[in-house]
Amino acid sequence: MLGELKVTGFSTYLHSINENNTLLVGVGEEADQTGSILGLKVSLFDATDPASPKQLKSVTVEKDKDTWSSSDATFDFKAFRWLNLGVETGLLILPVRVESWTQDQNGNFDGFYVYDVSRDGISLRMTISHVQSQDFFGCYASATLPQRSMVFDGNIMTVKGHSIVSTNLDSGKKSWKLEMPKPENQDSCMYW
């Protein structure tokens, strides 16, 4: 081991964003001092000096103790999308699920977060929702689409659960949405 870095939480996936493999985006979980997991965390690390790596920036999705967030990108690297926009700058596209444990369901979200990332910081550019409302529960067959994103001609196409959404990269406006049909036999439904 060349070096270590003490930070709260941990990254389960690291992605290099420069040619020297010294600037890394990390996706993982934030944790408190006791090690209890608090939710999704995106970090930017500088490993120019391997003996003394640094966390340059980090953001967490949670805004309060009654909120939980997660991303399939923490365990499925194909769910992670990096769009290079120049030297050490780009867009990070992640599938994100946010759940509020309160009666107010307005904090719930199921879709994708798009972050602007550079050495100067990490900022949320837009969110792309894959649900009609804050209600996650619905009747679908158990065949779900893997959480993926692609960029074509200035549009982000996101795939998650039972829908595909195309969103303009610059304006954030939804171009179209395709929903998988619900099964005719409602007895075979799975609810989540």
Which stretches of residues belong to each language-model region?
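Feature marking well-ordered beta-strand scaffolds used for ligand recognition
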Residues: 1-192
